[in-house]
Each structure stands twice: as structure tokens, then as C-alpha cells.
Amino acid sequence: MARPNPIIPGFNPDPSIVRVGDDYYIVNSTFEYLPGLPIYHSRDLDNWALIGHVANRPGQFKGAGVKPPGGAWAPTIRYRDGIFYVVVTDFFGRGNLLFTAENPAGPWSDGIELAIGGIDPDLAWDEDGTCYLSVSGLSLGSHEGFEGHNGISQVRINHITGEVLEEPRHLWQGSGLMFAEGPHLYHIGDYWYLLTAEGGTDRGHAVSIGRSTDRKSTV
């Protein structure tokens, strides 16, 4: 049987997915448009239904006056200990934000501002419960282009309060293409895998993955 492609038609860029039991949830970028950060649900990965939005009221995002290409960039959705998390960049707005909800359909929190620059944030947990936030190294509001980009960086954070617990450390520059972005970190077996996008957003766009037995040093 042919599977539907696209699985979610229309304007749904930068998908992030999480599995919770038999359920799958996807969140997407929405940039300057509100309501923002739609949450889709499926049980078979083929048929998806919109169940809510993370950003659906004033104050969660800067919103008014944000022009392209500002707004919600490259969210990540995760689940841990009964709580759903969405971490996202409000570009030209509030910066990197952490939203939480007990029900993925909402309501979602107002969003905690994270004291770290960069874009395309990701969350991952170690076996001992330590939470790591990874970001692409483009400065918020920067107009420097690719020259000032410093690859993928990472910090430990308190995922309850949003407190950043250490200075950012460099994790990976990428495979050699320019502008490593969109990091997603996974701990599978003996390895940490760092999935990234590279090469800009034109014809050279690519997906790269590095792995390491040491979370602090992806190779």
C-alpha cells in the first residue's frame, strides 16, 4: 500500500516528532504567523490530525510587528515524566523559549525565556536526568550571515525553571558544509547521535549526522 506523501500537506516546515506510547506528535515552524506552532497527532504515522497550537494567545511570542523572517523557528518537541516540552526560537522576538504542557493539545505555558543565544534549540536527557540544550550558533538578530556562525553548541539547563547551568561549549562544526543548524541529539545504545542540517537553505541543503560515545565530543 502506498503511503501518503506529504503526510501533512501545506505550510508545515521544520517538523520535530516525539513518540509517547502508541501516540506520535509533530510540531512545526510558523515564523511570524499566529496561532503558532501547530501540534499534530497520529497513531500510524500516515494519518495526522491538528489538535492544537502552542502559541495561541498574546504574550507567548512577540507577535505584533515581527516581520519575515522572524517568529517561530525550528521547534523541538519532547516528552519526559508526564510533561510535554517545546523549545523554539522566537527570532527577532523573545529569543529562545521553553514551553510546557501536560496535554499536547494544550493549554501550553507562557514560555520561559532561556538565557542562551543561537537558533533551532533542541532538548535531550542523559540517563541520570540531566537535560541538555543544543543550539545552532547564529546570533539572534545578527545580520552577519554565515561568517559569524560557530557550529553547534550545548549547555546544561534546568528543564523545570529554564535556568542555564553552564557556559555554552562547542559540540560540532558539521561535516564541512557551511552553517550547521537544526540540531537534534539522540542517545541510542552506546552512542550519542547529532543530526543536523547543513549547507544553507538553497540547492546545497543537506542532512548530516555525527556520533560519539561521549556526549561532549561528537565526531
Question: Which residue stretches match the model-derived regions?
Answer:
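Carbohydrate-active catalytic/glycan-binding domains of CAZyme proteins
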Residues: M1-V219
